[in-house]
């Protein structure tokens, strides 16, 4: 009889690193929704070179995902096969250089806005209301209040899936509405952002006005993943934004299991306490169907969905 050899654990197939490499890491505690299964492995690189060396040396059949603070992310209940990369302290720097800010990709958007305010640099106030890190903001061309990352990026640095480092102009990043054109396996490591001189008091006043507007209109203290769907092309939606289409479809307050469409802002899904990732995703798909039925508009997920369901299957991550 031929003895069957057990498969080699993923962690033992990965290259040596200077950062932290761990197996079977719970992801639910780090996501804003507080749902989802574990990462098969997680890598926290010591610095950009450690990240590049890991990507260059990993087996080509091992999938890689990067997450920040998981504020706009839904991890499915079966977890994430392969390696989840989470940039840490080495990527959190924010330095003012003239009228620019040199930032690591793991710096919080809100922190960058505060540093800009303290330096008397305007134009970055909108970042104060965007949850998450700059890496995620670059990846999705995050924006609010008629401003977006494409308006302030001078250049960015990234490492591709083969471990090669790149310095990119905005044109090379191919920004569009809530998207950039870089391949999914490229990982942003930093960027340079442009501001313009202004009075600190005026900047602070604008940021406070934005904070008050968010408090009044969004469920900031709920377990939520931020805006669920991107606003559709105005030419296709008659100028209506995603929340207006959702409201018109009768979905405000709609529930499925432990998931609910927010009563306060119906482009937000909420974990009421006992939701699974499957509840949240199914509710989102129900909303999409109802909007299509009532308005003919196909809403596109803005929340990134990763991993596999408990049935071992993975649904689409976009659309």
Swiss-Prot record:
- Per the Swiss-Prot or TrEMBL record, the active site comprises 178, 227, 302
Q: Which GO molecular function annotations are given, in alphabetical order? A: FAD binding; UDP-N-acetylmuramate dehydrogenase activity
Q: Does the keyword Transferase apply?
A: no
Query: What's any GO biological process attached to this entry?
Result: regulation of cell shape
Organism domain of life? Bacteria
Which cofactor is essential here?
FAD
Q: In which pathway does it act?
A: Cell wall biogenesis; peptidoglycan biosynthesis
Keyword hit for Mitochondrion:
no
Q: Where is the FAD-binding PCMH-type domain?
A: 35-198
**Cross-referenced HAMAP family:** MurB
The record's function comment reads:
Cell wall formation.
Could you say which protein family the record assigns here? Answer: Belongs to the MurB family.
Identify this protein by name: UDP-N-acetylenolpyruvoylglucosamine reductase
């Amino acid at each position: 009889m031929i003895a069957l050899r057990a498969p080699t654990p993923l962690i033992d197939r990965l290259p040596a690193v200077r950062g932290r490499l761990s197996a079977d890491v719970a992801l639910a505690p780090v996501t804003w929704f507080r749902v989802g299964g574990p990462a098969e492995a997680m890598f926290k690189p010591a610095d950009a070179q450690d990240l590049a060396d890991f990507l260059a040396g990993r087996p080509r059949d091992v999938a890689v995902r990067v997450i920040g603070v998981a504020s706009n992310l839904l991890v499915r209940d079966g977890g994430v096969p392969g390696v989840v990369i989470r940039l840490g302290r080495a990527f959190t720097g924010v330095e003012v250089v003239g009228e620019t800010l040199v930032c690591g990709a793991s710096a919080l958007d809100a922190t960058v806005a505060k540093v800009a305010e303290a330096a008397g640099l305007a134009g970055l106030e909108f970042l104060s209301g965007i949850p998450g890190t700059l890496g995620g903001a670059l990846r999705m061309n995050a924006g609010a209040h008629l401003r977006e990352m494409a308006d302030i990026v001078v250049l960015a640095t990234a490492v591709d899936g083969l471990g090669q480092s790149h310095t990119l102009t905005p044109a090379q990043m191919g920004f569009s509405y809530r998207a950039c054109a870089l391949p999914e396996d490229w990982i942003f490591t930093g960027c340079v952002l442009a501001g313009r001189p202004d009075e600190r008091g005026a900047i602070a006043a604008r940021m406070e006005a934005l904070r008050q507007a968010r408090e009044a209109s969004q469920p900031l203290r709920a377990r939520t993943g931020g805006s669920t769907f991107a606003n559709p092309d105005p030419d296709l939606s008659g100028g209506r934004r995603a929340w207006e289409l959702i409201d018109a479809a009768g979905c405000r307050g709609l529930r499925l299991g432990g998931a609910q469409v927010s009563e306060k802002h119906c482009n937000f899904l909420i974990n009421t306490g006992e939701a699974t990732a499957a509840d949240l995703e199914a509710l989102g798909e129900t909303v999409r169907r109802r909007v299509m039925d009532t308005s003919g508009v196909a809403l596109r997920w803005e929340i990134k969905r990763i991993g596999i369901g408990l049935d071992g299957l993975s649904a689409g991550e976009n659309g």
